[in-house]
Swiss-Prot record:
Its cofactor is Mn(2+). This is UDP-2,3-diacylglucosamine hydrolase. NCBIfam families: lipid_A_lpxH, PRK05340.1. The keyword Manganese applies. Binds 2 Mn(2+) ions per subunit in a binuclear metal center. Hydrolyzes the pyrophosphate bond of UDP-2,3-diacylglucosamine to yield 2,3-diacylglucosamine 1-phosphate (lipid X) and UMP by catalyzing the attack of water at the alpha-P atom. Involved in the biosynthesis of lipid A, a phosphorylated glycolipid that anchors the lipopolysaccharide to the outer membrane of the cell. PANTHER family: UDP-2,3-DIACYLGLUCOSAMINE HYDROLASE, UDP-2,3-DIACYLGLUCOSAMINE HYDROLASE-RELATED.
Length: 241
């Protein structure tokens, strides 16, 4: 009996080792789980479900094979793949969830999020995030020619890398006040999120009672998986080879 959580795999054609590691995880480690949650940034970027990139089909089929074995699959959008839609989710056998969302995990209410909502000190990014949530803008972008979307995504990734190189680590991390607010708002004592690439389990006090925040790791150097069982949460690392 276990529920699995992963995030920030950042799959792309340039890193076939990460794709192979994920496919291996889905085929050999995830079967038999009570559920698998992917908390965003499964892909390095996503410009629409109509992108014919063969990587997308390979990954969707690997998830679908797990779904067909009876493992429920859930996905929360990240800041890199916020345009991932129902067509891909249907092929992969996934259910799309909102951010944040609350689940019942072995009798405990847990709030899930990709995590970028919690980085409130990064005001520039939060402004950009609000813009990307505009439905009319998404509708317009997805109707651009595929080549145009690819060019825009490439330019935006370059700008993001340049900006992040000059930001402090504090600005790009979550703020305690935002964590506390989200927990209170959803009446939870536990939170699971990704985005910051700083895997850890943080225990703290919230309104005089114990609370826990679990941060998932990325898959750049090794796979990072959170394994939850009744009364237990454990972060594990998996080799990419």
């Amino acid at each position: 009996m276990s529920t699995l959580f992963i995030s920030d795999i950042h799959l792309c054609a340039q890193r076939p080792d990460m794709t192979a590691a994920l496919v291996r995880f889905l085929a050999h480690d995830a079967p038999g789980a009570d559920a698998l949650y992917v908390l965003g940034d499964l892909f390095e970027f996503w410009i629409g479900d109509d992108d014919p990139n063969p990587l997308h089909g390979e990954v969707a089929d690997a998830f679908a094979a797990l779904s067909q074995q009876g493992v429920p699959l859930y996905f929360i959008h990240g800041n890199r793949d916020f345009l991932l839609g129902q067509a891909f989710a249907k092929r992969a056998g996934m259910t799309l969830l909102g951010d944040p969302c609350v689940i019942e995990l072995y009798g405990e209410r847990v709030v899930l999020s990709h995590g970028d909502l919690l980085c409130t000190l990064d005001e520039g990014y939060q402004k950009f995030r609000r813009i990307t949530q505009l439905k009319w803008l998404r509708w317009l972008f997805l109707r651009l020619p595929l080549a145009r979307r690819q060019a825009i995504a490439h330019k935006m990734r370059g700008q993001s890398q340049m900006e992040n190189a000059h930001k402090s680590q504090t600005i790009m991390d979550v703020t305690p006040a935002a964590v506390d607010q989200m927990l209170r708002q959803h009446d939870c004592r536990m939170m699971i999120h990704g985005h910051t690439h700083r895997p850890a389990i943080h225990d703290f006090q919230l309104d005089g009672a114990p609370a826990r925040r679990i941060v998932l790791g990325d898959w750049f150097e090794q796979g990072s998986v959170l394994i939850c069982r009744p009364g237990e949460q454990r972060l594990e690392q998996h080799a990419l080879i």
